[in-house]
Curated annotation (Swiss-Prot):
Tissues in which the protein is found: Brain, and widely expressed in neural tissue. Highly concentrated in synapses of developed neurons. In developing neurons, concentrated in the lamellipodia of the growth cone.
GO-annotated cellular components: actin cytoskeleton; cortical actin cytoskeleton; cytoplasm; cytoskeleton; dendrite; dendritic spine; dendritic spine neck; filopodium
Cell compartments where the protein resides: Cytoplasm, Cytoskeleton; Synapse, Synaptosome
Protein's UniProt name: Neurabin-1
CDD domains given in the database record: PDZ_neurabin-like (cd06790), SAM_Neurabin-like (cd09512)
Residue ranges of the region described as Interaction with TGN38: 598-1091
Coiled-coil residue windows: 598-628, 674-825, 1036-1091
TM annotation in the entry: none
Basic and acidic residues bias locations: 1-12, 33-49, 140-151, 1050-1079
Summary of the function given for this chain in its UniProt record: Binds to actin filaments (F-actin) and shows cross-linking activity. Binds along the sides of the F-actin. May be involved in neurite formation. Inhibits protein phosphatase 1-alpha activity. May play an important role in linking the actin cytoskeleton to the plasma membrane at the synaptic junction.
GO molecular function, one term: protein kinase binding
Renumbered residue ranges of the record's region Actin-binding: 1-144
Annotated region described as Interaction with protein phosphatase 1, given as residue ranges: 426-503
Length: 1095
């Protein structure tokens, strides 16, 4: 709740700034409108508004009280007494720094303010004869505070409350606005302390005194407030004369608003006074005024009615819509002693009227003996939350704080005798009003110096130093450029925050229900009350002006109202500005931009939730105690409500239990006079009231214990529910943990399987590497053996060549011998010539003709010549080797596998070896003569079948090793059909062969796409990654496999092409050699023929 703070104290906390000066100027303009009289002549209460609105958070009464007590701690009793007399002024000027006390006060519906009477506690305080330092200073300071508030209470306005029904409680805001501005009243963030409970005892005690005593000691025109309740502690052995001076709390009581008797006895009440609304009060059993004599009760009622008549013109009850009403707590000021011997009949003169009342009051003030009863609801009255629509009401029972501050002091047993002198001394200046402008305090002066220097020319005074509370008429303009504006001015921060908001104007028409919004000031709270976040819309009243307009929403910031900025102001200031608006109201609303996290919205929602919970608790609280009151029947009648203060059970109650002394001797009524009998009766009433209070306190404690028990049961149930939830959560977590364990076991199993597979693959890989090495070694061995065989063949060919040459030489020798023999035999020369002529060439002579001619013509040497000729090989045609070559190539092609590097090398080398051997053999045959062809043919026929056999063994060995590797490494081996389909070159493959190749690679899913695109061998070799993706091969592993195979095939084709080119070159060389040999042979044959023809 916002608390009051004097502007003088505020200026000591925060220095002035240009922003603050601007706001103060605006508020002064508002204040001037409050002070103007209304057109109908009703005067607005200037003092009631607590001077100007002090910007900043208000401090409560406790702060000021404690501060003032500390200031008085070190003062002497005589100095304190002097201060009390000096600081009372004659007038009531309103200081611009006068504090506003939002405490309780009372008003009448006709506009007059009740003048309250002095309380018993104040009368008792005058008999303090033991002036003991700090305790006396505290007590006198408290009295001074009672007197100080006299000029501030009379003009404050307040609505009369009604009894709040259970379930319908609505806490009223601090500023009780009228119906027209109810919608714009500022919302409070905490419950009003008016709903707290106070002790029922003191109100019952004061009700006892109120029955028969006269309200004579009343000063006209005075109505004073106090922020503090003071309870004294008194000795237990009280003499019977002074029992009536027991401490009690003063209560606010409107004596002119009684429902029955005051309307008949009062002649000067104004006609516009509204009908009284009875407030139900808890009456204590046995203390009803009905038990008193009717004369005394009528006398007390009439006497109290007359009390407030002269005070009627002091103030009016009209509540201006723009003026916040403060709650104040009135304490009595006039102090008189009651003397038991004064007859009660003197009080009847008060019934006559105000003319006879004034002299009697002067008499009672100067030396009156009657005790002035105090209405005891000032601190313990039952506070009922106000209905904002309620203007009428007769009684106002309010208090602002349930804490009771006790001022402790010691008393002598004879305080009743010495108190009269102080009473008279204090009453002498009772009509002097306290003037806050003249307030000062004295502090201890300089100590006496023991030795004063002789040459000192000045002298220091040792008198007490007076410290006056000064007020500045002009704000101190601080021009300090070194101060950081961000750190020194909260307004600067707020203006920076407003710049980030989305601002838009809104105009509302204020109707009879107000603006339809409630505001809340969101702030940090440690910086003299400036709302660090600004003034925000807390709620929007259903059906109000703001809801009908629809533009203002909850959590919006009110930046400006009718040109008055609400940036950096207090909630009270904002509420005052809103209440002062009329007609068409212009707003500037700030709203946070979309997407931002609003801390204000969170705070407001938390505040609303807290208020809702507190309201529910309060409703249950009232419902519970209303039920208790209905059961026990402790409600008082309408007649008793005026004398007995309302009591709100529950809460912390400061119950003072007085153990009154009882005389052992019982006096008869004849031995006692009327005053003693009255005193004895009051003593018994007090005892009864105390007993009732104790019973009520025990009931309250019992109810609190039951509530605590219920709360414990709820907590126990909540804890049990939490335990069950935790158990369920633990079961869930345990199930999750078990699932995680099983998952870990599964993953471990998979890992072990993967490791075993990896080890198996590694073994296969090592075995394959070993086989490859073995194969390479065998290949090297085969090459070496082949080289050795080739050398052997060359040596054999050389031996054959030498042998052939020897044979040719021998043949020539034999032919020469034959020719010689023929010459010798002249008879056969012609026959030999005919034979040579008939034969055109040596190849045309057949074997049979030669042999016949030889047998016919031969003579003596015929047998030897025929033997030589038979040894010679007859000349035959050269054998055709093309058939053998074709046969060898076909045998190789039939066993042809995929063109791997080793197989291609084997096939090429075997073919080369074959051709070279054939060609060499036939070259030899070309050089042979007709007689040597048989040997050449034999050598050629013997070498030719040998070479294909070697190549076949090589191919077989290669096939076996590669098949073993395929079986070891590949998961799916190549089928014979697949191998046969690839016997052709890759670029010659058809679409079907490409499909077979894909099936061999376990890529069956892509066969349809390849077939649809008609991918042949040439297109297959041209495929890359993008084309494979286009063909639907999305798997990167499949694409990598196909690319790898295509790369290997391309490399194999390139090597085959190079080998083919090499073979072509070798064949070309062989052809050239054959041609050269043919030329040589032809030349040799020509030479031979020429030589044979010459002889």
């Amino acid at each position: 709740m916002l608390k009051a703070e004097s502007s003088g104290e505020r200026t000591t906390l925060r220095s002035a700034s240009p922003h603050r000066n601007a706001y103060r100027t605006e508020f002064q303009a508002l204040k001037s409108t409050f002070d103007k009289p209304k057109p109908d002549g009703e005067q607005k209460t200037k003092e009631g508004e607590g001077s100007q609105q002090s910007r900043g958070r208000k401090y409560g009464s406790n702060v000021n009280r404690i501060k003032n007590l500390f200031m008085q701690m070190g003062m002497e009793p005589n100095e304190n007494a002097a201060i009390i007399a000096k600081t009372r002024g004659k007038g009531r000027p309103s200081s611009p720094q006068k504090r506003m006390k939002p405490k309780e006060f009372v008003e009448k519906t006709d506009g007059s303010v009740v003048k309250l009477e002095s309380s018993v506690s104040e009368r008792i305080s005058r008999f303090d004869t033991m002036h003991d330092g700090p305790s006396y200073a505290k007590f006198t300071e408290t009295r001074k505070m009672f007197e100080r508030s006299g000029h501030e209470s009379g003009q404050n306005n307040r609505h009369s409350p009604k009894k709040e029904k259970a379930g319908e409680a609505e806490p009223q805001d601090e500023w009780g606005g009228s119906k027209s501005n109810r919608g714009s009243s500022d919302s409070l963030d905490s419950l009003s302390p008016r709903t707290e409970a106070v002790s029922p005892t003191v109100s019952q005690l004061s009700a006892v005194f109120e029955n028969s005593e006269s309200p004579g000691a009343i000063t006209p025109g005075k109505a004073e407030n106090s922020n503090y309740s003071v309870t004294g502690h008194y000795p237990l052995n009280l003499p019977s004369v002074t029992v009536t001076n027991l401490d009690t709390f003063g209560r606010l009581k409107d004596s002119n608003s009684r429902p029955s008797s005051n309307k008949q006895a009062t002649d000067t009440e104004e006609p516009e006074k509204s009908e009284a609304v009875p407030v139900p009060e808890v009456a204590q059993k046995g203390t009803s005024l009905a038990s008193l004599p009717s004369e005394e009760r009528q006398l007390s009622t009439e006497a109290e009615d007359v009390t407030a008549q002269p005070d009627t013109p002091d103030s009016t009850d009209k509540d201006s819509p723009g003026e916040p009403s403060a709650e104040s707590q009135a304490m009595p000021k006039s102090n008189t002693l009651s003397r038991p011997k004064e007859p009660l009949e003197d009080a009847e003169a008060n019934v006559v009227g105000s003319e006879a009342e004034q002299p009697q009051r002067r008499d009672l003030t100067g030396g009156g003996d009657l005790t002035s009863p105090d209405a005891s609801a000032s601190s313990c009255g039952k506070e009922v939350p106000e209905d904002s629509n309620s203007f009428e009401g007769s009684h106002v029972y309010m208090h602002s704080d349930y804490n009771v501050y006790r001022v402790r002091s010691r008393y002598n047993s004879d305080w009743g005798e010495t108190g009269t002198e102080q009473d008279e001394g204090d009453d002498s200046d009772e009509n002097n009003y306290y003037q806050p402008d003249m307030e000062y305090s004295e502090i201890v002066g300089l100590p006496q110096e023991e030795e004063i220097p002789a040459n000192r020319k000045i002298k220091f005074s040792c008198a007490p130093i007076k410290v006056f509370n000064t007020y500045s008429n002009e704000d101190y303009d601080r021009r300090n450029d070194d101060v950081d504006p961000v750190a020194a001015s909260a307004e600067y921060e707020l203006e920076k925050r407003v710049e980030k908001l989305e601002l838009f104007p809104v105009e509302l028409e204020k109707d009879e229900d107000g603006l339809g919004i409630s505001i809340i000031g969101m702030g940090v709270g440690a910086d003299a009350g400036l709302e660090k976040l600004g003034i925000f819309v807390k709620t929007v009243t259903e059906g109000g002006a703001a809801q009908r307009d629809g533009r203002i929403q909850v959590n919006d910031q009110i930046v400006e109202v009718d040109g008055i900025s609400l940036v950096g102001v207090t909630q009270n200031f904002a509420a005052t500005v809103l209440r002062n608006t009329k007609g068409n109201v212009r707003f500037v609303i700030g709203r946070e931009k979309p997407g931002q996290v609003s801390e204000v919205a969170q705070l407001i929602s938390q505040t609303l939730e807290q208020e809702r919970r507190q309201r529910e608790l309060l409703e249950r609280h009232y419902a519970q105690y209303d039920a208790d009151d209905d059961e026990t029947g402790e409600y008082a009648t309408d007649e008793e409500e005026d004398e007995v203060g309302p009591i709100l059970p529950g809460g912390d109650m400061a119950i003072e239990v007085f153990e009154l002394p009882e005389n052992e001797d019982m006096f008869s009524p004849s031995d006692l006079d009327t005053s003693k009998l009255s005193h004895k009766f009051k003593e018994l009433q007090i005892k009864h009231a105390v007993t009732e209070a104790e019973i009520q306190k025990l009931k309250t404690k019992l109810q609190a214990a039951e509530n605590e028990k219920v709360r414990w049961e709820l907590e126990k149930n909540q804890l049990q529910q939490n335990i069950e939830e935790n158990k369920e959560r633990m079961v869930k977590l345990e199930s999750y943990w078990i699932e995680a364990q099983t998952l870990c076991h599964t993953v471990n199993e998979h890992l072990k399987e993967t490791q075993s597979q990896y080890q198996a693959l590694e073994k296969k890989y090592n075995k394959a590497k070993k086989l490859i090495k073995d194969f390479q070694q065998k290949e090297l061995d085969f090459i070496r053996r082949q080289e050795v065989e080739r050398k052997k063949l060359e040596e054999v060919e050389k031996a054959h060549l030498v042998e052939v040459q020897g044979l040719q030489v021998r043949i020539r020798d034999l032919e020469a011998e034959v020719f010689r023999l023929l010459k010798q035999n002249g008879t056969q020369v012609n026959n030999n010539n005919n034979i040579f002529e008939r034969r055109p060439s040596p190849g045309e002579v057949s074997k049979g003709d030669t042999m016949e001619n030889v047998e016919v013509k031969q003579t003596s040497c015929q047998d030897g010549l025929s033997q030589d000729l038979n040894e010679a090989v007859p000349e035959t045609e050269r054998l055709d080797s093309k058939a053998l070559k074709t046969r060898a190539q076909l045998s190789v092609k039939n066993r042809r596998q995929r063109p791997t590097r080793t197989r291609l090398y084997d096939s090429v080398s075997s073919t080369d070896g074959e051709d070279s051997l054939e060609r060499k053999n036939f070259t030899f045959n070309d050089d042979f003569s007709p007689s040597s062809t048989s040997s050449a043919d034999l050598s050629g026929l013997g070498a030719e079948p040998k070479t294909p056999g070697l190549s076949q063994s090589l191919a077989l060995s290669s096939d076996e090793s590669l098949d073993m590797i395929d079986d070891e490494i590949l998961d799916d081996g190549q089928s014979p059909k697949h191998t046969q389909s690839q016997s052709r070159a890759v670029h010659e493959w058809s679409v079907q062969q490409v499909s077979h190749w894909l099936v061999g690679l376990s890529l069956d899913q892509y066969v349809s796409e390849f077939s649809a695109q008609n991918i042949s061998g040439e297109q297959l070799l041209q495929l890359d990654g993008n084309k494979l993706k286009a063909l639907g091969m999305t798997s990167s592993q499949d694409r990598a496999l196909v690319k790898k195979k295509l790369k290997e095939m391309k490399m194999s084709l390139e090597k085959a092409r190079k080998a083919q080119e090499k073979m072509e070159k070798q064949r070309e060389k062989l052809r050239r050699k054959e041609q050269e040999q043919m030329q040589r042979k032809s030349k040799k044959s020509e030479k031979m023929t020429s030589t044979t023809e010459q002889p």
